[in-house]
């Protein structure tokens, strides 16, 4: 037990962590706005956005999954005409960005979870089944499930559920790349249970290393923690573990002092490759100062019970003894999704292919979002002839500047990559785009654009078609978007509000999904965080850590979890992290 009193620890916390005062101020100031926001949403759900129920039979929506995508869909759905059946083996939502904090006791596991039955609009008829879907049958509109509790209500472990609409938000599983020994010997960090197991293993490692008869070599092996994967999750866990060891465990386990090592293996040339170069360089330098051994260009080839084999790009193979490995190298497809993909002719893909409205290609009334799906953004050049023909209203074979402008308005809505291309090239408008068409004088209003010039102007925009990252931010936006589509399904069936159909007549029912990147964080330990926000804005250091606290507190799905998470942060500042092995 520590020799500090509560008051001494409190004083030490404020002295060692001057940011604590600012965190309290930020939390207090932002609290009023968050309350107002929550109350505004509650009012909208009760009155402004409600749909008056008629005597018609409710459409049944089956929602598979209670992760970011599924929970966002459930929270934002506000139409009483639906009966929502939630099916998931997990009866709660987990705030996964804080899982690295759970592994080291910075935040408690129960603080980042919210029971799924507490989530959702009051006017929407919802029910939950704790079961795992193992088969989807699009022909009969059924999903087949296996109860987690052993038996279902009719005495059988397996049962089926009918649907009118199916929303697939099952997420993904950790990708082992079929490397021998990974499944048997590594810890993953995808679920709350994973974080709890890691935390217990860390404490058990220190307890084992404190035994008197242990050799120095064995003690060093037990206290060697290896992280595979230099993405945000792997980097944040390594940083959290370093803080846990240096701030709490070393003083509690004197035998362990000098024997603890943390190694980060990354197959690429740098860690945090999805971040700005400035963040990547700072993270690598900070880890070097902190004593975290970052091995770049190292690819794991095999994992044994007590050592891991890694190969460099030069072909050199080394054996690294370890006490615990955390595997954080990417995501793979769940078995139920693989089976479904084979049924609908998508067997060679890594994720379900959807269109821009999140509809699974080759199916009816089935939607997929989050990590289990990827959007197949249609390319402009696939429709360029049809676009030109529709824009050429007088059938003259050329487009006037006005016709081109009107066509571009529709194109920008239907094909998000056009707007991204204009921004990437820092183009101010249509005139800049026309310069690439090699027209004589783009300043003239009587310009006439032939189809070859039209194609030339749009030839490069498809270079901005990119797969969306598998992040909570993407999944949450997709869930909110799909909920709004469902809310307005009947209304938009009669009066479509989407872009003009380039092939065919009329309009699409809805505007296609468009992802808005709001920024990303990379906590690096020592009360320092790297933040990359839209507009090429990069901030690194203690100030970004305060922003991280504020944003992550505000993004909690309930006031219960928000209060618990902030309380855990305060507890850690004052009392330190809990080192008990429970």
Swiss-Prot record:
Xref: Pfam families: EF-hand_1, NDH2_C, Pyr_redox_2
Name of the protein: External alternative NAD(P)H-ubiquinone oxidoreductase B2, mitochondrial
Record's bilayer topology term: Peripheral membrane protein
Family: Belongs to the NADH dehydrogenase family.
Presequence positions on this chain: 1-38
Top EC class, one word: oxidoreductase
Tissue: Mostly expressed in seedlings and roots and, to a lower extent, in cotyledons, leaves, stems, buds and flowers.
Keywords on record: Calcium, FAD, Flavoprotein, Membrane, Metal-binding, Mitochondrion, Mitochondrion inner membrane, NAD, NADP, Oxidoreductase, Peroxisome, Transit peptide
Domain EF-hand, chain residue ranges per copy: 379-414
Residue positions binding FAD: 60-90
GO CC field: mitochondrial inner membrane; mitochondrial intermembrane space; mitochondrion; peroxisome
Membrane-spanning residues: none
Binding note for cofactor: Binds 1 FAD per subunit.
Function: Alternative NADH-ubiquinone oxidoreductase which catalyzes the oxidation of mitochondrial NADH does not translocate protons across the inner mitochondrial membrane. Calcium-dependent NAD(P)H dehydrogenase; more efficient on NADH. Binds calcium ions.
Signal peptide annotation: none
